[in-house]
Amino acid sequence: MAANGLMAASSVFLHRPVHPHFSFSSRTNQMVPLGFKGRVSFIGNVKRCFPVVLSMGKSETFEEAGNSVAPGNGISIMVNGCSGKMGKAVIKAADSAGVNIVPTSFGSVEEAGQTVEVCGKEILVHGPTEREKVLSSVFEKYPELIVVDYTIPSAVNDNAELYGKVGVPFVMGTTGGDRTRLYKTVEESKIYAVISPQMGKQVVAFLAAMEIMSEQFPGAFAGYSLEVMESHQASKLDASGTAKAVISCFQKLGVSYDMDQIQLIRDPKQQIEVVGVPEEHVSGHAFHLYHLTSPDKTVSFEFQHNVCGRSIYAEGTVDAVLFLAKKIRSKAEKRIYNMIDVLREGNMR
C-alpha cells in the first residue's frame, strides 16, 4: 500500500525455511546470517506461502448505528505534542478532514510560550504549570473538544489524570507510561477515551486477527520458541506497544516469552543495511518481525508488518476522533474504547 509517501505492508505467512541459517533481506534478496544477536529476517521472495484467513463478525455500519459524524461536523481537537512529528502529522490529517484545530497545545517547560505553525495555523504551546487552567478554558470555549495526545511516555499518566479531572474526552496515541495506572485513572474518571498502542487501522486489523486466533486456539504453539525484532526511529525510547500486544497473543497460544527479550533496533546504519529500512524513512518507520520455531526445528512461522512514514497512524487517529465524537453525541457508555472498537464501527475513510 502506498499513499502520501507511505508504504505499509502486513503479512502472515506459513512457510518452510529456505535455509536453517539464512533468510532473505527484504530489500536486496541477499541472504543474511541469522546467528547474530540482532538477527532479522524480512522475507523477500518465499515460494511456499499460504495465507492464514480469519473471519470476524459483521461490523456495524455508521448507517445502522445512527448518529453519524461527518468529518468537520463541529468537532474541535487540541493536539498535545504538536511540535513533534506525530503531532504535526495528526494536525495535517485532521485539517484535511475538515476538523477544527484548536490553536492551543501542551508541551515541555522548554517549549512553553513557543508558537508552532502547521498547515498555516499558529498554535501556542503552554508549559506544565498552567495546564489545568488552560484546558478548562479551552473546553469551555469548545464544548465538543476532543484532546489528542502524542506527547512523551513520562507524561502519559499525568496527562490522563488532567483530562479526567477536567472531564474532557481524549484519544491517547502516546505509548509507554504506567498502563495499569492509566486505565484505572480513566475508568475512575468516567470519561470517553480511545486508548490504543497502535493507531494504524490495518495493523490493528492484524492484531484483531491475532486475538481471535489466540482465543480460539489456546496452546496451539505450545513448545515453540519465539524471536521478536522491532525497528523504530532512534527517538522512540520504549519498546513497541504493538509488539507487546502481539507477544501477549503468542503467550496465550502457549509460547513462553519475556517482554525484555524483544530485540530493539535503533541504530540507523543497522536499520538500513540489515533490516532493509529505506534511508528516507529511517527517521519515521515501524518494522516488526515475529519468528516462531518448533521444538525440533522442522517448522517455522513468520509474521511481519512494516510501516514507513506516519500517515497511517495520523489517519487512524482522526478516525478515532470521529468515532469518539459519535459516541459522545449518541450518549453511549462513558468508557475506554480501543482501535478495534473503531474498526468494528465500520466507517473507514
From Swiss-Prot:
Active site: H232 (proton donor/acceptor), K236 (proton donor)
Pfam family, one: DapB_N
GO terms classed as biological process: diaminopimelate biosynthetic process; lysine biosynthetic process via diaminopimelate
Top EC class, one word: oxidoreductase
Transit peptide stretch: 1-53
Ligand binding ((S)-2,3,4,5-tetrahydrodipicolinate): G241, T242
Catalytic activities: (S)-2,3,4,5-tetrahydrodipicolinate + NAD(+) + H2O = (2S,4S)-4-hydroxy-2,3,4,5-tetrahydrodipicolinate + NADH + H(+); (S)-2,3,4,5-tetrahydrodipicolinate + NADP(+) + H2O = (2S,4S)-4-hydroxy-2,3,4,5-tetrahydrodipicolinate + NADPH + H(+)
Binding residues for NAD(+): G81, C82, S83, G84, K85, M86, G173, T174, T175, S196, P197, Q198, M199
GO CC annotation terms, alphabetical: chloroplast
Localization per record: Plastid, Chloroplast
Superkingdom as given in the UniProt entry: Eukaryota
EC number of this enzyme: 1.17.1.8
Pathway of action: Amino-acid biosynthesis; L-lysine biosynthesis via DAP pathway; (S)-tetrahydrodipicolinate from L-aspartate: step 4/4
Signal peptide span: none
Keywords: Amino-acid biosynthesis, Chloroplast, Diaminopimelate biosynthesis, Lysine biosynthesis, NAD, NADP, Oxidoreductase, Plastid, Transit peptide
Gene Ontology terms for molecular function: 4-hydroxy-tetrahydrodipicolinate reductase; NADPH binding
UniProt family annotation: Belongs to the DapB family.
NCBIfam families per the UniProt record, alphabetical: dapB_plant
Purpose: Catalyzes the conversion of 4-hydroxy-tetrahydrodipicolinate (HTPA) to tetrahydrodipicolinate.
Name this protein carries in UniProt: 4-hydroxy-tetrahydrodipicolinate reductase 2, chloroplastic
Species of provenance: Arabidopsis thaliana (Mouse-ear cress)
